[in-house]
Amino acid sequence: MSNFQAALLLTLLAGLSTGIGSAMALAVRHTNKRFLALSLGFSAGIMLYVSFMEIIPQSQEALSAGLSAKAGAWVSTISFFGGMLFTWAIDQMVPSFENPHEMSMIGPMTDAEKSDTRLHRMGIFTAAAIAIHNFPEGMAVFFSALSNQELGIVIASTIALHNIPEGMAVAVPIYFATKSRKRAFSLSFLSGLAEPLGALVGYTLLRPFLTPFVLGIVLASVSGIMVYISLDELLPSAEEYGEHHLAITGLIAGMAVMALSLLLLT
């Protein structure tokens, strides 16, 4: 399997985890929120640590090969904040009501108080919002895996984990509005396909220019995307699902596991 195929497969698997979240929401009546909080904090810890300790140094090394060390550090830093700005801009495209970063957390599957029409609309717009947000996430997984497959597996796993509650957020309102498990699952599943689509779009646009210098810029931008996702989505969601100390415990554990794995791999 080529690097391209492996990177695309990892991105596809990460995106399709929204379908896992949908299946979980439709199969069980209660979500174990404490475990979810710990898991989301764990994912944030992994993504933050690997961004600062692995991806940014790789970016600076690639950029410094064609520039001076100082110039490479400057370009890497600007690209890092550019990645954050790019993800923030996508966030602003989605109204807060439909934005998965702003919506209320998922509760038990009880009778809905709102009308079926409103619930159905909420589910549709949530699916669209998640699809938009999955574009930069797909690029983050794909380009990380293209640079380093082991790193790509780690990032794909953490993105997949945080896609699970997003799949739940799509499935629950659609199911209550339509009483159709098939429709709820299908919409959630389709929203996840935006992740490999984002990877393909990014690769198609950048492929003619994908030199080591450009890859260094992309890696720094990817780290910015990952840090933004961790701070804007994973940690706030972990705290809302569980409690502050549980989220921080997961965060520290994720960092420790990532640090140990990097030490063992080097």
UniProtKB/Swiss-Prot annotation:
It comes from Chlorobium luteolum (strain DSM 273 / BCRC 81028 / 2530). Mediates zinc uptake. May also transport other divalent cations. Fe(2+) binds at N134, E137, N163, E166, E195. This is Zinc transporter ZupT. The lineage of its organism: Bacteria, Pseudomonadati, Chlorobiota, Chlorobiia, Chlorobiales. One of its GO terms (cellular component) is plasma membrane. The keyword Transmembrane applies. Belongs to the ZIP transporter (TC 2.A.5) family. ZupT subfamily. Zn(2+) binds at E137, H162, E166. The chain crosses the membrane at residues 8-28, 36-56, 71-91, 123-143, 152-172, 185-205, 209-229, 246-266. The keyword Phosphoprotein does not apply.
